[in-house]
Swiss-Prot record:
The lineage of its organism: Archaea, Methanobacteriati, Methanobacteriota, Thermococci, Thermococcales. Belongs to the UPF0147 family. This is UPF0147 protein TK2131. SUPFAM superfamilies: Ta0600-like. InterPro entries: Ta0600-like_sf, UPF0147. It comes from Thermococcus kodakarensis (strain ATCC BAA-918 / JCM 12380 / KOD1) (Pyrococcus kodakaraensis (strain KOD1)).
Length: 83
């Protein structure tokens, strides 16, 4: 697994999934994105595209705290670099 994907997974775990201020549906979506990224049976670009789709869907949630939205946007930017 690429180092970039490992870093993205770590950021999602530490700053979204484990943050109890973040609504449950957003944490669940971040967990889904992590599962997709860790599925090594698929090409890294496909995993990144699937994770982007999941995270983009929740990025506009009005209940998302602003600091979490910023983290999601940063993760989306990093995922776009995965090839």
């Amino acid at each position: 697994m690429s180092e970039l994907i490992q870093q993205i997974v770590q950021v999602l775990k530490e700053q979204v999934v484990q943050d109890t201020v973040v609504p449950r549906n957003i944490r669940r979506a971040a967990e889904q994105a992590i599962e997709v990224l860790l599925d090594e049976s698929r090409d890294p670009a496909v995993r990144a595209a699937d994770a982007i789709a999941i995270l983009e869907e929740i990025s506009e949630d009005p209940n998302m705290p602003m600091h979490t939205r910023t983290i999601i946007w940063e993760v989306l930017g990093a995922l776009e670099q995965v090839k």
